[in-house]
Amino acid sequence: QGDIPVIVDPKAECIQWFQPDVIVDAILAKRNLGTKITDAPFVIGVGPGFTAGEDCNCVVETKRGHTLGNVIWDGSAIPNTGVPGNVGGYSIERLIKASADGVIEPKAVIGDLVRKGQIVAITGGEPVYALMDGIVRGMLQPGVQVTKGLKIGDIDARAKQEHCRTISDKARAIGGGVLDAVCSYEKSRGKYALILLAAGQSVRFGSDKLKAVVEGEAMYESA
């Protein structure tokens, strides 16, 4: 019916009974939380923390820049710098971080326009202030337990509400890299051959070079 099934499975126990052909670890924790190259016939790690050939078959780059979305078949993605990419002239200011340990109580929701210095959330009873003007692009749900300094949301200086309901350029590039990797895997499983036809008059092989005998056999014979 075209519906996408979603399973809440923190320990990924469904891998044991579902036995998928492909696993994509897109947790984006900046480190491997337990994914193994033996979990499925083809395992993709997204972002830093994975090494192709060791804990996964390939890695997809997630850092903004020229290599965003690239499929890495040998080695790892660019290490996490802890500094978010520049969007609209802002970097670290884009992040909304918990001001204290405790439960989060959002004061702004995705799509809200906020001003620098505005309270956008309460964490552990302490206010969290926006560090820039813009639109809220991400925010954790109410009641989530957080720790001081944890990223709980982000702000976009471009301030376009439609961006909150569409796939971002970064997400599209990363998704494209995953798709490219899966397609490469599918091709490797099948039996493929490339035939380059170059029939025609030839000084060396005569009127039909595909039928010319080389080392006792015709270069090409139809089935």
Task: Go through each PLM region and give its residues.
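N-terminal glycine-rich phosphate-binding loop and ensuing alpha1 helix
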Residues: 192-223
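Well-ordered secondary-structure scaffolds
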Residues: 1-189
